[in-house]
């Protein structure tokens, strides 16, 4: 199964999100979403491959997945770069690929998904994303939510 179509972008992301059921119930998802409200000409990354908003025990978590559906193995440098980029807006970050170099598994906080299956290889650890970045991505995926998204750092109820 392929997860990237050159003419379309990300495809079949639902199979990857199913692997992440440990994060709770999937309540919204999206693909090819801008994950930064502001970006400059030097920024080469501002569109995320796949996102899922999960809810467990009244807590919503935004999960970002960068998909590398290519033959070459993913390097630790690529893994760290995407963790930093997605980590600005996501509670959990995963890298999905067919092959990983050995050092990728030691990148702290990053989760790994094998595209062969797909299968969860390593669970991600919770990050502390910027609240505005988190809200920006969630509102693109689920603009019809009646209230502002619940976030781990939220202290008061916010209206529409």
Segments the model singles out, each with a brief description of its role:
Residues 46:
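Beta-rich catalytic cores
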Residues 23, 57, 88-89:
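Alpha-helix C-cap/termination motif
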Residues 24-43:
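A short acidic/basic microdomain associated with nuclease active sites
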Residues 27-28, 34, 49-53, 62-64, ...:
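Ordered hydrophobic segments in well-structured contexts
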């Amino acid at each position: 199964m392929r997860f990237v179509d050159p003419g379309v972008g990300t495809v079949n992301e639902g199979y990857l999100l199913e692997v992440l059921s440990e994060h709770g119930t999937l309540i919204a998802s999206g693909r090819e979403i801008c994950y930064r409200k502001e970006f400059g000409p030097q920024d080469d990354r501002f569109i995320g491959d796949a996102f899922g908003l999960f809810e467990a025990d009244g807590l919503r978590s935004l999960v970002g997945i960068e998909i590398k559906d290519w033959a070459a193995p993913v390097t630790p440098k690529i893994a760290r770069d995407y963790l930093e980029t997605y980590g600005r807006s996501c509670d959990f970050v995963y890298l999905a690929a067919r092959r990983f170099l050995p050092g990728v598994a030691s990148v702290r906080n990053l989760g790994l998904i094998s595209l062969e299956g797909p299968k969860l290889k390593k669970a991600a650890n919770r990050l502390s994303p910027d609240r505005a970045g988190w809200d920006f991505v969630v509102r693109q995926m689920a603009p019809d939510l009646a209230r502002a998204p619940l976030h781990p750092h939220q202290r008061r109820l916010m209206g529409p």
